[in-house]
Amino acid sequence: MNFTVSFSTLMPLAPVMIVALTAVVVMLLISIKRNHNLIATTSVVGLNLAALYILLELFGGKFVPANVMGMFMVDPFTMFYQFMILVASLACCTLSHAYIETYKDNREELYLLLLASVAGAMLMVASSHYASFFISLELMSIPVYGLLAYTYQRSQSLEAGIKYLVLSATASAMLLMGMAYIYAYTGSLSFYDSVQALFGAIKQPMVLLGLALIIFAVAFKLSLAPFHKWTPDVYAGAPAPMATFLATAAKVATIGLFVRYLLASGAIMVNSLVTVLTIIAVLSILVGNLLAVRQVNLKRILGYSSIAHFGYLLIALISMTYASLGSVTVYVVTYVLTTIGAFGAVALMSSPYNNVDEAQSLADYRGLFWRRPVLTATLTVMMLSLAGIPLTAGFIGKFLVVMAAVTTQHWFLAAMIIVGSGIGLYYYLRVMVVMYMTPPETPRIDADAHWGQKVGGLMVLAAAALVIILGVYPDPMINLALKAEILSPLHFMLSQQQ
């Protein structure tokens, strides 16, 4: 077998190569001389160059979809999701700079781990082969173990890293076993080439078990119930910027890969698997919202909230129309922006190397409005968006998901979205009420007086502005989401039904 790879063959993966090259440059700079500001700036420049390349490709009028070595499919869907991953990663970089500025140990390796994980995440959304599926997933996950436990002097951070390592390794084993069962019956590792063989053997128990194991492994990565137990503990223990990365970039990559896999392999057409996804969606909505009601830790609230939000997202995927696939992308955009803003506010409030700990407890936010009114307004916007209140981006995402469920007559699922949103409104309002209460005489933890003049603060303010703008004028976002098409026969068939 003659297997050669030229530079031109890999050019469609140029954004990934830019990020990988940035990681190499960062490694060299660390070996020459440690300089936190230089390393952080280099990382941000590299991520910006990759994002700029994607924008030029998409809007330059010359973009041509490509199949790279039969392992990766670079289409509008890939580029759109890679851009979202880069935006989320840039937010994490800027938040990390201020967060670990006073960290007494080595700080520079954090950016190296982050860049490696970003490269894996970007490859994930392009994967069209079981081998690239697994390798890119592990390339994203393994650096995350280090990121979560990076501030190991805090016992919570070390615990979060070890807990995620053990449970994630278990999920990876499930994933490999599922792939092995499917390969045994289809004889192909390509999503696209195995469609006919997959449906020919779909009644085989081992094939169904293989598909189920893959879904369970992905459900773990997305922290969907009943595979959610790690989420609140890891979010609460991890450094705030790293929790932001896990909640945004890592999940964007996973949902992007999952959507491509379901459409390219045709697995979404298997009724028994749709039933499993429906059960997972309903459980996630109920478990995430009901457990969040009891929490007094803001990061744990956001952790349980994310479980419910990806339950809503599954409903759009289950609905299986051309418009509903666009609504998945819209919901991901609104969720990422809102989560960046919410976790960003927590990161700005936290300086665990000058103070006692991170600002996690709701008591730390009591009366915040009277000390930091702009930061309070920003966090309020994020809570309203997560709750799905009109004039915020979160409302648009949730409205489109409800429309997708109603259009396909999934009345029960539409009702579950409404019930879940009603429960969620309670704990989001509780966070807002606490911030406007009478402040304590001496707050335990507070944000820097000039937080808005820092890069991280400007990023959080920009996220809040986008949440409001997209809530008032969502048309550009919706149009872009519909154009982010996956190159698959099933997606083409759905587009022709419009």
From Swiss-Prot:
Its EC number is 7.1.1.-. It catalyses: a quinone + NADH + 5 H(+)(in) = a quinol + NAD(+) + 4 H(+)(out). It is a multi-pass membrane protein. Keywords: Cell inner membrane, Cell membrane, Membrane, NAD, Quinone, Translocase, Transmembrane, Transmembrane helix, Transport, Ubiquinone. It holds the Pfam family Proton_antipo_M. GO terms for biological process: ATP synthesis coupled electron transport. GO terms for cellular component: plasma membrane. InterPro entries: NADH-Q_OxRdtase_suN/2 (IPR010096), ND/Mrp_TM (IPR001750). The keyword NAD applies. Its main location: membrane. The keyword Aminoacyl-tRNA synthetase does not apply. GO terms for molecular function: NADH dehydrogenase (ubiquinone) activity; NADH:ubiquinone reductase (non-electrogenic) activity; quinone binding. It is found in: Cell inner membrane. The chain crosses the membrane at residues 10-30, 44-64, 68-88, 109-129, 130-150, 164-184, 207-227, 239-259, 273-293, 301-321, 328-348, 377-397, 412-434, 458-478. It comes from the Bacteria. Belongs to the complex I subunit 2 family. NDH-1 shuttles electrons from NADH, via FMN and iron-sulfur (Fe-S) centers, to quinones in the respiratory chain. The immediate electron acceptor for the enzyme in this species is believed to be ubiquinone. Couples the redox reaction to proton translocation (for every two electrons transferred, four hydrogen ions are translocated across the cytoplasmic membrane), and thus conserves the redox energy in a proton gradient. NDH-1 is composed of 14 different subunits. Subunits NuoA, H, J, K, L, M, N constitute the membrane sector of the complex. This is NADH-quinone oxidoreductase subunit N. It comes from Acinetobacter baumannii (strain AB0057). The gene is nuoN.
